[in-house]
Amino acid sequence: GYGPGNGGGTGYSLGNRKALNKPQPEYTCQEQGRVAVQVTVDRNGNTISVTAGVQGTTNTAKCLLDQAKIAAQNTKWQADSNAPEKQVGKIIYTFSLN
């Protein structure tokens, strides 16, 4: 990426499961704000679908949504054999210009 800012994760929720590997989104534009991404995760801890720009998002610039989506898709979660087959959670990324 390029630009003076950085993308930082501020939080996530998926029941009581932890994110094992949570890549940071790349910063590719002069935009800042919060992007909330809804994630659907299988019992093995794989993110199987993502929707960027859900409730909690403060900036819907395409460059932020796209990067948040990529980071969310690559997030690996704790496996949980007792979890629902498809568990829905949320990750919130905060993009800020330095």
Features from the language model and the residues they span:
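A short, well-structured alpha-helical segment
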Residues: S13-L14, Q30-A36, T40-K86
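Acidic, low-complexity proline/glycine/alanine-rich linker and hinge segments
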Residues: G1-T28, D66-N74
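Short, low-complexity, Pro/Ser/Thr/Gly-rich segments in the mature regions of secreted, periplasmic
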Residues: K90-N98
